[in-house]
């Protein structure tokens, strides 16, 4: 069998290739600050390879914790955990109450939804806005709030590595 068809070596999976926009110098530099908020773009947040460790809770040993993929997140990104940040992207509402969006995915590209390409795990931020905001679809929006850099799981499946406690939302073009 050709080596290319043999699969990964017995020692583990092959390392992930860096993303197209991989820029180690950017990851190492401090972001611009606006009124105490770090300006964090997806060029930085998605600027490293990340792939969740495969795990199927349905076939795992009962009570087994899901494996962590946190070691793939660079320290230069983890340092933004619990920091005030501004992240700009496109709103994809996931929860609404009384006509207002209370939770949404902030995605890198408007093509990363229903009929577009599936984003990488580091190309979205789960934003919680308890008071709710009006839906702003198909235009870039800037979200202000406290960023969390940690794995979130739902029923054993990793669902995000970035979460933001939304304080304010603005139309990025206006």
Describe the function of each predicted region.
Residues 1-174:
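OB-fold and OB-like single-stranded nucleic-acid-recognition modules
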